[in-house]
């Protein structure tokens, strides 16, 4: 095997590692839930009153969202919340 082939293989493996490593770091935890589902409920900074759902660690719970800010643990329906966060 020539030096060019060895260098090509090393380059390919390096690029593969650089591309896949961040994906591995941000992958779902072992129980199948994403980091989003681990966030607390957060009604946001405004005073509107929108019905939303958040995952509380066990199930999806209704809360009032103020309309701006907050975090990503906020879903428009209980079904969407359960689909994303409930253990499979």
UniProtKB/Swiss-Prot annotation:
Gene Ontology molecular-function annotations: potassium channel regulator activity; serine-type endopeptidase inhibitor activity; toxin activity
Compartment(s) where it occurs, according to its Swiss-Prot or TrEMBL record: Secreted
The keyword Signal is annotated on this UniProt entry: yes
Pfam (any one): Kunitz_BPTI
N-terminal signal peptide: 1-27
Alphabetical list of SMART domains matching this protein: KU
Protein's UniProt name: Kunitz-type U15-theraphotoxin-Hhn1r
Disulfide bonds: 37-85, 60-81
Residues making up the propeptide: 28-33
Residues at the site labelled Reactive bond for trypsin: 47-48
InterPro entries linked: Kunitz_BPTI, Kunitz_BPTI_sf
Residue stretches making up the BPTI/Kunitz inhibitor domain: 37-85
Tissue specificity note: Expressed by the venom gland.
One Gene Ontology cellular component annotation held by this UniProt entry: extracellular region
Gene Ontology terms: biological process: envenomation resulting in negative regulation of voltage-gated potassium channel activity in another organism
SUPFAM superfamilies: BPTI-like
Function recorded in the entry: Serine protease inhibitor that inhibits trypsin at a molar ratio of 1:1.
């Amino acid at each position: 095997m020539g030096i060019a082939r060895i260098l090509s293989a090393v380059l390919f493996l390096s690029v593969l590692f650089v591309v896949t490593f961040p994906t591995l770091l941000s992958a779902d935890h072992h129980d199948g839930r994403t980091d989003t589902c681990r966030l607390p409920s957060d009604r946001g900074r405004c005073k509107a009153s929108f019905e939303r759902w958040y995952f509380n660690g066990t199930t999806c719970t209704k809360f009032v969202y103020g309309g701006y800010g907050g975090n990503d643990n906020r879903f428009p329906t209980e079904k969407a919340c359960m689909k994303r966060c409930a253990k499979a």
